[in-house]
Amino acid sequence: MSLSTTGLFRITKNGTDLSRLYEDPTQVACLYGNHVYYQHYDHKKGLELYSAKIDGSKNKLLKREAISPYSVSGNTIYYSGWAKEHNIHSMDISGANDKVIYNGNCTSVIKSGDYIYFLNMNQNYNLCRIGLDGGSAETIVQYKLATYNITNDGNIIFYQVDNGQNNGIYMYDMSTGTNEQIAAGNFNFIHIISDYVFYEDYEGKTAYYYNISTGENKNFNPTVEKD
């Protein structure tokens, strides 16, 4: 019997009911409502943006481009162009009404509140933001960043500095203007759930979590409990 571990999977929170929605390789995926928006891989065409229901049905091509669906909000996908340009776009979750809202050399787009955040590749990967309708960009973090994420309330940004001098994950509280390093070194995959920030070392060997309320920073070694 052959065993395949590639594809897009779903699983219940207690570790049961593992099922595969899509069998070929994929990268970025985003759950929004009862649909998953994900990068669908084709051996000839490469990565394209698709959507599917959470049961794997109604698989639909949205865009023939390797768009990363990091930010889906209010029935709108916000993304940066990939193939021919790197402008910031907005598009209905149906794939219709695609329009450019900011011209620039942008990546890692996240919509938070009334702003769209992005890394400005023309500005040494500084973190910038614009309004939902575009306009002038405002610089938020003046360091070269590798990745970042924002709390649900939009008040705190966690980011990885990648300038070769003071690399690490930092916490920027926008309400107070304070910056604090929470981990020194090189890390990836910053995810935020409630008061917890999860991240992984650059080699992918160790995962960590940081408690925003208490300031505790610990190794993350979960065990899966089954009914």
Can you name each region flagged by the protein language model?
Residues F198-D227:
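Blade-level signature of beta-propeller repeat domains, shared across WD40, Kelch, NHL, RCC1
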Residues T12-T16, K53-S57, D92-A96, G131-G135, ...:
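Short loop/turn segments that connect beta-strands within beta-propeller blades
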Residues E23-G33, R64-G74, G104-G113, K144-G154, ...:
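Repeated scaffold domains used in trafficking and secretory/extracellular systems
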Residues L3-R10, K44-S51, K84-S90, Q123-R129, ...:
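Structural motif
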